Amino acid sequence: MIMFCVQCEQTIRTPAGNGCSYAQGMCGKTAETSDLQDLLIAALQGLSAWAVKAREYGIINHDVDSFAPRAFFSTLTNVNFDSPRIVGYAREAIALREALKAQCLAVDANARVDNPMADLQLVSDDLGELQRQAAEFTPNKDKAAIGENILGLRLLCLYGLKGAAAYMEHAHVLGQYDNDIYAQYHKIMAWLGTWPADMNALLECSMEIGQMNFKVMSILDAGETGKYGHPTPTQVNVKATAGKCILISGHDLKDLYNLLEQTEGTGVNVYTHGEMLPAHGYPELRKFKHLVGNYGSGWQNQQVEFARFPGPIVMTSNCIIDPTVSAYDDRIWTRSIVGWPGVRHLDGDDFSAVITQAQQMAGFPYSEIPHLITVGFGRQTLLGAADTLIDLVSREKLRHIFLLGGCDGARGERHYFTDFATIVPDDCLILTLACGKYRFNKLEFGDIEGLPRLVDAGQCNDAYSAIILAVTLAEKLGCGVNDLPLSLVLSWFEQKAIVILLTLLSLGVKNIVTGPTAPGFLTPDLLAVLNEKFGLRSITTVEEDMKQLLSA
């Protein structure tokens, strides 16, 4: 059987249409796993439909609220490739739905939900049979009837909500809960399960998702800073230190904290990878002296870099790619919603098996000459610099700020972002976040009167800090955010980037430049609408874009 998936930047694009619709997607996801993820999403939409109904009776089931976004997160690009676990999530969704339904019926014997997913049952235990059942729920099943524009808007909403669900799970892990957010999530998820086909309603929904995600990023920021302190500028070594070692990748700071606690005094050093780099800025994480540095570059290079790492690797969230290609699958471990067939999975917070493996491996034989980069420009630090920025602008020492961030990826056109960073004029500042920074974060940019020209604000969700800074600057200057000497040049790859974009658009931020390509699910008509309404456009050449942005 074949699949249909068009959710990430590397999706197949042909004159006949966009999307991975073969036996395997470009990410390595098989048709079986992709189809079963469609089935899981349908089950989750049915669960959300009953969660909406339950709230009408004052019933709030926290098990449902915590499970639903987490399971949805498992369908995000490069997270879970393990078909049996995807089916397990679907079964759990249905069990929770039935329990919630029973609670509703206990209050009102006539309780009903008008949603096509509300009574979904799995037809078999056989994966092949379930894959055939999943064909009912493939996202483009009614494309001929609704057209590409409606399909594209549905997918914009679905993928945007998926990105928000990922951030909801990150916040939940840190003890953050907001009933209004979960109520809104369930309402949108259930509505998407009705196969909506009204263009205006879908556009409004996409903005609602963006506004909701701003709240999600706020509680995630509160969770991270509440537990680990406010990030402050910190130098991080990106070269090897002699000794036994463990590499931890992903976004989950709690997993990193637990690993650091359990490795303390064992002689095992811990390195961050990918989106875990900003962890070094948090006081409660950097206090561990055996958190010795950051290893590697963008996630897309992991098959080469992980093969060279002389210790075990822990994947806490996206992005994992096939570890069997370079034969390190015997020393990579998955956590939480992450999965790869045949790779060992850690069900809880006990990292002892990983630590034992690290102690049995060679580790790095010698320390390399250190190369230090600076991270840790979190929300509090950025706000503390607001007056300095305004002073530099007023004295014409600072001409422009470029927010140059987003996802990284393998496409060759992404060298644009390296080239762009290198030609930013000396009187301009680069604010960066997310893993796209690996395209230029080891380069030297100097400073403007002591203020670094490259300011690393953190993970992708730390777009929240950048937004708060922009709002603060606008308030102090008595203008709108769009009137600031600020340009956003964003790289996208997957669904977290989609919801960050929706968040910015929902807040009224205009004239964003994105690349390296437009999302495959957005038609020329939809791109034209976004351009007309928000000034959103794709990158052209580095020189042309720089000229246009500086003259705006």
Swiss-Prot record:
Q: Which UniProt keywords apply?
A: 2Fe-2S, Cytoplasm, Iron, Iron-sulfur, Metal-binding, Oxidoreductase
Protein's cellular compartments: Cytoplasm
UniProt keyword Metal-binding, yes or no: yes
EC number(s) stated in the UniProt entry for this protein = 1.7.99.1
Q: Which InterPro entries match?
A: HCP/CODH, Hydroxylam_reduct, Prismane-like_a/b-sand, Prismane-like_sf, Prismane_a-bundle
Which residues take part in binding hybrid [4Fe-2O-2S] cluster? Answer: 251, 275, 319, 407, 435, 460, 494, 496
Which residues does [2Fe-2S] cluster bind? 5, 8, 20, 27
Q: Which family does the similarity line name?
A: Belongs to the HCP family.
PANTHER family reported for this sequence: HYDROXYLAMINE REDUCTASE (PTHR30109:SF0)
Name the record gives this protein: Hydroxylamine reductase
Q: Which organism is it from?
A: Shigella boydii serotype 4 (strain Sb227)
